[in-house]
């Protein structure tokens, strides 16, 4: 950084008509520096250096805690304060800041699956107008891991039966089932997930057994493992539900969704593959074929005279 005297000399020489190259030679700096200083109305203030005298006795301890992946300055501040540190928090933050580039990255390595192997499931919600009234629309997104094709099912509730119906509809839409279905830790699918020991909802296991897929749950607080479907939830909110805000009914919502997926979403180019989901879907023809599945709450749609036959057939 140049001194105040250099700053005023640059201004004076330029005012007298000196060329920038001559000013740079006289001052002993680059032409780029001269141009930068000419733009300043006042001499740039020097950055004050933090004195680390009070912190110096604790630097070895701080470095040890950083090596143990403890980067919370408040935690470290409380620890060194108990050890006799009398300085402030800002001094500690100033010391830690340039070391943060050494912090291990939390970036998730993208895991690409084979065609017909994995489907990722997630829910989103948005407020729109249905039948003339503002209401919350829950929508389940089921995304094929390989092709990035997805199916969306809008429903008034985000419960177990609508979760299962969304998967049944997705399998029917894709023309078959996959080998694994990845879900988050919603109660409709997962009752408990403790250090990898997963207890699945019995209803979800019945669905998995019927379609012969392997249920899988994300690690708690690690939802990024199903990043493909989470990006689709955001994509829907920022695209479909921005363009379409009014619907006659939930049936109308789902009709519009399927039409929009066919016309727009399946034809978007995936930058990492230089292909569209529609093009990549040609490799997913080996997904397993499916048969129908009757949901518990669907029995309520039938009159009592046929419930007995449906009940026996369902089991």
UniProtKB/Swiss-Prot annotation:
GO-annotated biological processes: DNA integration; DNA recombination; transposition
Domain of life: Bacteria
Protein name: Transposase for insertion sequence element IS640
HTH IS21-type domain ranges (all copies): 5-66
Listed GO MF terms: DNA binding
Organism: Shigella sonnei
UniProt keyword annotation of Lipid metabolism present: no
Residues covered by the Integrase catalytic domain: 111-285
Its biological purpose: Involved in the transposition of the insertion sequence.
Keywords from the UniProt entry: DNA recombination, DNA-binding, Transposable element, Transposition
Presence of the UniProt keyword Transferase in the record: no
Family membership: Belongs to the transposase IS21/IS408/IS1162 family.
